[in-house]
Amino acid sequence: MNKNVMVKGLTALTILTSLGFAENISNQPHSIAKAEKNVKEITDATKAPYNSVVAFAGGTGVVVGKNTIVTNKHIAKSNDIFKNRVAAHYSSKGKGGGNYDVKDIVEYPGKEDLAIVHVHETSTEGLNFNKNVSYTKFAEGAKAKDRISVIGYPKGAQTKYKMFESTGTINHISGTFIEFDAYAQPGNSGSPVLNSKHELIGILYAGSGKDESEKNFGVYFTPQLKEFIQNNIEK
């Protein structure tokens, strides 16, 4: 297995006024490869597992507990230039769960592209975060050939922050590294990787290659990573 994944810069961070994101063009290290293209738009994201997914300006995150979101380090950092705001389960036709200001960020101390984002409980519209989202449960484990889904906001502002779900298969797991063939694009960084029970296996962080035969990559949640996340869920 080659772990030297080429993560390419992008210019995918632009404006969506309804999310309160400022316009900006910036190279961000979250290029996503094409793979198995079983993709559908989620027009109503008010029910689980979709209402646990949040939009950052340049990526995606997933709610795991009270006021607590998991995403990539590079997404949490890049969100600084967008007034530190996230949108709960925004979709093209369904009712969103509000826009929330970020309270703080806790980065995983290891090499893994993993960060915890805490948000203020009350949205800019006066909504309660925890009453408008669901918490995604952790999977006990996963293995090669398991079916998975990836939910997020590919191409972000270019698609007006429509939510999409793609499905595929796990190819390989090694330590905290997971490879799979579910289709993804820029903006899917931080997207939850879920098993068939909608339990959280990990989060997507990168891709490699130029055609649909190439694969995508994620941070696999080992017991150690799950312990880090659980210890940082707001009480």
Curated annotation (Swiss-Prot):
Its EC number is 3.4.21.-. It comes from the Bacteria. Keywords: Hydrolase, Protease, Secreted, Serine protease, Signal. One of its GO terms (cellular component) is extracellular region. GO terms for molecular function: serine-type endopeptidase activity. GO terms for biological process: proteolysis. Its main location: secreted. Residues 1-35 form the signal peptide. The keyword Secreted applies. InterPro entries: Peptidase_S1_PA, Peptidase_S1_PA_chymotrypsin, Peptidase_S1B, Peptidase_S1B_tx, Trypsin_dom, V8_his_AS. It is an enzyme of class 3 (hydrolase). The active site is at residues 74, 113, 189. It is found in: Secreted. Belongs to the peptidase S1B family. This is Serine protease SplA. It comes from Staphylococcus aureus (strain JH9).
